[in-house]
Amino acid sequence: MHPKIGIIICGFNENRQFVPNVYIQSVRYAKGIPLLIPLVRSDRMIDDYVSLCDGFLFCGGEDITPLLFGEEPQNGNGKTDITVDLFQIRLMKRVLASRKPVLAICRGMQILNVSCGGTIWQ
């Protein structure tokens, strides 16, 4: 049976949520079944996704809102989206509690870090 890998959305705007195709192709190449996880607000739905998947891929994207790791935004910071940040942090905490495998790339590593109480140098 092929593992189901939850790929968390990397980009979001008012009309669409998306994941770069390279992540989907990579999971397929590794004989996994890619399942895209959209931004959801329900804790119950987050728990359902965590139960459904065998592993998770948190991919790259925009900067994390500095307020979420105890700092004020500085001039020159990139674009942030606190709604996406809060969703991904909630999801990461539940994934870690489930002890299922996580691959975190770029922003995904920052989400992992902040979810565990870490900070980021801006």
Feature locations, PLM:
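N-terminal beta1-alpha1 cap of cysteine-dependent amidohydrolase-like domains
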Residues: M1-I105, N113-S115, W121
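Catalytic nucleophile loop
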Residues: M109
